[in-house]
Amino acid sequence: MTGKPEGGAAIPLRVHDACFTSEVLGSLKCDCADQLALSLDYIAGPGAPGLVIYLQQEGRGIGLANKIAAYALQEGGLDTVDANRALGLPDDAREYSSVAAILADLGIASVRLMTNNPRKFIGLAGYGLEIVERVPIEFPPNPCNARYLRTKKEKLGHLLERV
Protein backbone atom coordinates (compact mmCIF):
# COMPACT_ATOMS: atom_id res chain seq x y z
CA MET A 1 0.00 0.00 0.00
CA THR A 2 1.18 3.49 -0.77
CA GLY A 3 -0.11 6.51 1.07
CA LYS A 4 -3.07 6.61 3.39
CA PRO A 5 -6.64 6.68 2.06
CA GLU A 6 -8.44 9.81 3.16
CA GLY A 7 -11.89 11.24 2.69
CA GLY A 8 -13.41 8.22 0.98
CA ALA A 9 -11.79 8.94 -2.39
CA ALA A 10 -11.55 5.94 -4.70
CA ILE A 11 -8.03 4.50 -4.64
CA PRO A 12 -6.33 2.37 -7.30
CA LEU A 13 -6.60 -1.30 -6.32
CA ARG A 14 -5.04 -4.35 -7.91
CA VAL A 15 -6.23 -7.71 -6.59
CA HIS A 16 -3.54 -10.03 -7.90
CA ASP A 17 -3.56 -13.80 -7.72
CA ALA A 18 -0.29 -15.68 -7.34
CA CYS A 19 1.28 -17.02 -10.52
CA PHE A 20 4.37 -19.00 -9.58
CA THR A 21 5.02 -20.04 -13.17
CA SER A 22 5.34 -16.48 -14.49
CA GLU A 23 6.40 -14.53 -11.41
CA VAL A 24 9.09 -16.96 -10.24
CA LEU A 25 9.89 -19.21 -13.19
CA GLY A 26 9.51 -16.55 -15.89
CA SER A 27 6.93 -18.40 -17.98
CA LEU A 28 5.60 -16.43 -20.95
CA LYS A 29 2.38 -18.51 -21.17
CA CYS A 30 0.44 -15.73 -19.43
CA ASP A 31 0.77 -12.04 -18.69
CA CYS A 32 0.50 -12.28 -14.89
CA ALA A 33 4.03 -11.11 -14.07
CA ASP A 34 3.62 -8.16 -16.44
CA GLN A 35 0.29 -7.25 -14.83
CA LEU A 36 1.81 -7.37 -11.35
CA ALA A 37 4.80 -5.22 -12.36
CA LEU A 38 2.60 -2.63 -14.08
CA SER A 39 0.24 -2.52 -11.10
CA LEU A 40 3.08 -1.98 -8.64
CA ASP A 41 4.55 0.79 -10.81
CA TYR A 42 1.15 2.45 -11.25
CA ILE A 43 0.37 2.40 -7.55
CA ALA A 44 3.87 3.54 -6.55
CA GLY A 45 3.63 6.48 -8.94
CA PRO A 46 2.28 9.95 -8.26
CA GLY A 47 -1.27 10.16 -7.03
CA ALA A 48 -0.95 7.88 -4.00
CA PRO A 49 -2.57 6.21 -2.15
CA GLY A 50 -3.01 2.84 -3.83
CA LEU A 51 -3.08 -0.81 -2.90
CA VAL A 52 -2.09 -4.21 -4.29
CA ILE A 53 -3.62 -7.21 -2.53
CA TYR A 54 -1.73 -10.40 -3.41
CA LEU A 55 -3.76 -13.59 -2.98
CA GLN A 56 -2.62 -17.21 -2.99
CA GLN A 57 -5.15 -18.32 -5.62
CA GLU A 58 -2.79 -19.91 -8.15
CA GLY A 59 -4.21 -20.95 -11.50
CA ARG A 60 -7.52 -19.11 -11.18
CA GLY A 61 -7.92 -20.72 -7.78
CA ILE A 62 -7.25 -24.38 -8.67
CA GLY A 63 -3.79 -24.52 -7.07
CA LEU A 64 -0.31 -25.05 -8.47
CA ALA A 65 -0.46 -28.84 -8.87
CA ASN A 66 -3.73 -28.67 -10.81
CA LYS A 67 -2.39 -25.77 -12.86
CA ILE A 68 0.61 -27.87 -13.91
CA ALA A 69 -1.74 -30.73 -14.84
CA ALA A 70 -3.81 -28.27 -16.89
CA TYR A 71 -0.62 -27.05 -18.60
CA ALA A 72 0.09 -30.64 -19.67
CA LEU A 73 -3.37 -30.86 -21.24
CA GLN A 74 -2.80 -27.53 -22.97
CA GLU A 75 0.40 -28.91 -24.48
CA GLY A 76 -1.84 -31.66 -25.89
CA GLY A 77 -4.10 -29.11 -27.60
CA LEU A 78 -6.73 -28.08 -25.06
CA ASP A 79 -7.14 -24.42 -24.20
CA THR A 80 -6.94 -23.16 -20.62
CA VAL A 81 -10.69 -23.44 -19.97
CA ASP A 82 -11.13 -26.88 -21.53
CA ALA A 83 -8.05 -28.15 -19.68
CA ASN A 84 -9.60 -27.17 -16.33
CA ARG A 85 -12.88 -28.79 -17.32
CA ALA A 86 -11.12 -31.99 -18.43
CA LEU A 87 -9.66 -32.19 -14.93
CA GLY A 88 -13.13 -31.73 -13.41
CA LEU A 89 -12.21 -28.26 -12.19
CA PRO A 90 -14.09 -24.96 -12.49
CA ASP A 91 -13.13 -22.31 -15.02
CA ASP A 92 -12.41 -19.94 -12.15
CA ALA A 93 -12.45 -20.95 -8.47
CA ARG A 94 -11.28 -17.68 -6.96
CA GLU A 95 -13.18 -15.88 -4.22
CA TYR A 96 -12.75 -12.44 -2.75
CA SER A 97 -14.16 -12.39 0.79
CA SER A 98 -10.66 -11.80 2.19
CA VAL A 99 -10.28 -8.75 -0.04
CA ALA A 100 -13.55 -7.33 1.25
CA ALA A 101 -12.37 -7.89 4.83
CA ILE A 102 -8.99 -6.22 4.21
CA LEU A 103 -10.59 -3.21 2.55
CA ALA A 104 -13.18 -2.87 5.33
CA ASP A 105 -10.41 -3.01 7.93
CA LEU A 106 -8.55 -0.25 6.09
CA GLY A 107 -11.71 1.84 5.77
CA ILE A 108 -11.67 1.64 1.97
CA ALA A 109 -15.13 1.55 0.38
CA SER A 110 -14.43 2.91 -3.10
CA VAL A 111 -11.79 1.84 -5.62
CA ARG A 112 -10.52 2.16 -9.15
CA LEU A 113 -10.07 -1.54 -9.91
CA MET A 114 -7.11 -2.57 -12.03
CA THR A 115 -8.36 -5.63 -13.92
CA ASN A 116 -9.35 -7.09 -17.26
CA ASN A 117 -11.56 -9.68 -15.58
CA PRO A 118 -15.30 -8.92 -15.32
CA ARG A 119 -15.77 -11.75 -12.80
CA LYS A 120 -13.36 -10.02 -10.43
CA PHE A 121 -15.31 -6.79 -10.86
CA ILE A 122 -18.61 -8.56 -10.11
CA GLY A 123 -17.12 -10.60 -7.27
CA LEU A 124 -15.81 -7.55 -5.45
CA ALA A 125 -18.93 -5.47 -6.10
CA GLY A 126 -20.92 -8.34 -4.56
CA TYR A 127 -19.29 -7.52 -1.22
CA GLY A 128 -20.53 -3.94 -1.40
CA LEU A 129 -17.34 -2.40 -2.71
CA GLU A 130 -17.97 0.65 -4.88
CA ILE A 131 -15.97 0.32 -8.09
CA VAL A 132 -15.96 3.73 -9.74
CA GLU A 133 -13.66 2.80 -12.61
CA ARG A 134 -12.03 -0.20 -14.23
CA VAL A 135 -8.40 0.47 -15.05
CA PRO A 136 -7.28 -1.90 -17.82
CA ILE A 137 -3.88 -3.57 -17.54
CA GLU A 138 -3.18 -5.05 -20.92
CA PHE A 139 -0.11 -5.90 -22.95
CA PRO A 140 0.29 -7.00 -26.55
CA PRO A 141 0.18 -10.80 -26.72
CA ASN A 142 3.40 -12.70 -27.34
CA PRO A 143 3.67 -15.94 -29.34
CA CYS A 144 3.56 -17.97 -26.10
CA ASN A 145 0.41 -16.42 -24.61
CA ALA A 146 -1.69 -15.29 -27.59
CA ARG A 147 -3.92 -18.38 -27.55
CA TYR A 148 -4.30 -18.22 -23.77
CA LEU A 149 -5.35 -14.56 -23.85
CA ARG A 150 -7.71 -15.15 -26.77
CA THR A 151 -9.36 -17.98 -24.80
CA LYS A 152 -9.72 -15.75 -21.74
CA LYS A 153 -11.39 -13.12 -23.91
CA GLU A 154 -13.68 -15.51 -25.79
CA LYS A 155 -14.60 -18.00 -23.06
CA LEU A 156 -14.19 -16.05 -19.83
CA GLY A 157 -15.24 -12.62 -21.09
CA HIS A 158 -12.00 -10.84 -20.24
CA LEU A 159 -11.90 -7.27 -21.49
CA LEU A 160 -8.92 -7.45 -23.81
CA GLU A 161 -8.67 -5.14 -26.80
CA ARG A 162 -5.26 -6.18 -28.13
CA VAL A 163 -6.14 -9.85 -28.62
Role assignments for model-derived ranges:
Residues 1-163:
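Catalytic domains of riboflavin
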